[in-house]
């Protein structure tokens, strides 16, 4: 039988043998991560580690390594995120400590508003580390959204309404902070009621409100107490209405273009309905 370790490149395997001699495979968690990413739980002595590798062209490992090296300290020092053990950017491999806990996305505890309060609290600490002003952020995103429109498969009338609206938007200087980029239960584990972060592969500097996009679309609509608990933990609601509207429109256009390109009819229809509601 082929082991998950056999999927590693020779260079990755050589590094792993040097870093964790005699390590044994405990669990393959690759299905919880993005396409092109291998995630393996290994045991070495009394300790467990998570090893991530990425296929050529997959940028998530570069982002995660940048996060580890400069921005995850508030979480790692509190035991709320793994610590970096070893890494080789060229070989596209990272070794980190393994966090105990069950995936939050499949845990019954994810229905507890306390988990969302913790999520808000952790995110506020992360965002508060730094901020920069960027005059080009909004104009560049608008140009990208306009370029995507022709590949969405949307009705001409809706495309024209979207184009007209986007070109009318103001382009204010934007405050960017370190963001996680995929802040939702699939990026968390729960250990006896404590939320921990397991994946930072979409780290980048963005507006703070970006990290609420997935929660708002999926979790907050299920139960408004989750939203209230999150904002309590965060200390405020960073979703300034006009900026939030622009983000929602651009995100929906991006998803529509992806769905049209890949043939996901249901997602395409949902994106169309979302955009019709946003730009009636």
Where are these regions (language model features)?
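A conserved alpha-helical element in kinase catalytic cores
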Residues: 48-97, 102-126, 225
């Amino acid at each position: 039988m082929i082991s998950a370790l056999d999927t590693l490149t020779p260079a990755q395997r050589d590094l792993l043998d040097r870093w964790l001699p005699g390590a044994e495979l405990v669990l393959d968690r690759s299905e919880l991560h993005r396409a092109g990413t291998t995630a393996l739980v290994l045991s070495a002595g009394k300790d467990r580690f998570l090893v991530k590798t990425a296929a050529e062209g997959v940028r998530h490992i570069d982002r995660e390594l940048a996060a580890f090296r400069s921005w995850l300290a508030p979480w790692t020092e509190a035991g709320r995120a793994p610590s970096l053990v070893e890494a080789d950017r060229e070989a596209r491999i990272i070794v980190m400590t393994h966090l105990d806990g069950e995936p939050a996305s499949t845990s019954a505890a994810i229905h507890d508003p306390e988990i969302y309060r913790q999520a808000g609290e952790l995110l506020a600490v992360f965002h508060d580390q730094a901020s920069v002003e960027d005059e080009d952020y909004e104009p560049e995103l608008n140009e990208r959204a306009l370029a995507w429109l022709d590949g969405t498969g949307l009705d001409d009338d809706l495309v024209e309404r979207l184009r007209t609206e986007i070109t009318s938007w103001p382009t204010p200087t934007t405050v960017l902070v370190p963001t996680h980029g995929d802040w939702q239960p699939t990026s968390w584990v729960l250990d006896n009621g404590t939320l921990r972060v397991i994946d930072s592969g979409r780290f980048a500097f963005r507006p703070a409100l970006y990290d609420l996009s997935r929660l708002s679309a999926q979790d907050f609509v299920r139960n408004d107490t989750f939203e209230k608990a999150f904002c309590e933990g965060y200390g405020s609601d960073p979703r300034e209405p006009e900026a939030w509207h622009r983000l929602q429109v651009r995100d929906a256009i991006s998803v529509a273009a992806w769905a049209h390109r890949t043939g996901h009819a249901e997602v395409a229809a949902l994106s169309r309905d979302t955009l019709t509601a946003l730009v009636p």
